[in-house]
C-alpha cells in the first residue's frame, strides 16, 4: 500500500511482505520514500539485516514496529544512507530496540539528506538490471525448494 501526506510518501508492507525483496522494490518504484512495517513475529538478526538491506538497495527509509516479548521485539529503523560524502561506509541504523523493552519509540529521518542522497547515489531505480528479470518471472520451482502446499 502507498500513502502520501503531501510532504512524504509512505509505503506499507506487513510482516510477511518483508521476507521478500520484491515487496520493498515495488513500493520504491511506486514512489515510497519511507517504508513502514507493522510486524508481529520474531525479529531475529537475519530479518533485521534484511530490513537494513531493503533500505540500502532501494534508497528508502525503513521502520518496523514490533511488540516486545517472546518471539517478537526489536523495533527498528534504518536510513538508506550507507556512505558519507567522502565515500566512507556509515552505520545506517537509526533505531534498534531490544526484544524486552516496552514503550513508544521514535525514529527521526533527515528527509532532506535522504532525498539528496537519492539524487546522487547509484541504487534504487538508477541502474536496475531489468533484462535479468525474465529468469525471476519463471514459476518453475526446482529442488531443493519444492514444498507441500506450495503455490505453483
Listing of model-derived features with the role each one plays in the protein:
Residues 2-4:
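Structural signature of eukaryotic scaffold interfaces centered on beta-propeller domains
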Residues 9, 18-106:
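CN hydrolase (nitrilase-like) catalytic-core segments centered on the catalytic cysteine
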Residues 67-152:
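C-terminal beta-strand edge segments of enzyme domains
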Amino acid at each position: 500500500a502507498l500513502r502520501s501526506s503531501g510532504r512524504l510518501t509512505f509505503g506499507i508492507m506487513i510482516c510477511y511482505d518483508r521476507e521478500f525483496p520484491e515487496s520493498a522494490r515495488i513500493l520504491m518504484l511506486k514512489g515510497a520514500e519511507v517504508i513502514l512495517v507493522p510486524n508481529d513475529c520474531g525479529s531475529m538478526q537475519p530479518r533485521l539485516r534484511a530490513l537494513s538491506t531493503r533500505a540500502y538497495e532501494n534508497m528508502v527509509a525503513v521502520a518496523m514496529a514490533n511488540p516486545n516479548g517472546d518471539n517478537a521485539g526489536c523495533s527498528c529503523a534504518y536510513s538508506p544512507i550507507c556512505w558519507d560524502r567522502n565515500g566512507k561506509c556509515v552505520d545506517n541504523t537509526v533505531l534498534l530496540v531490544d526484544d524486552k523493552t516496552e514503550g513508544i519509540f521514535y525514529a527521526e529521518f533527515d528527509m532532506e539528506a535522504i532525498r539528496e542522497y537519492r539524487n546522487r547515489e547509484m541504487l534504487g531505480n538508477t541502474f536496475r538490471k531489468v533484462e535479468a528479470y525474465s529468469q525471476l518471472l519463471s514459476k518453475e520451482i526446482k529442488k531443493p525448494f519444492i514444498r507441500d502446499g506450495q503455490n505453483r
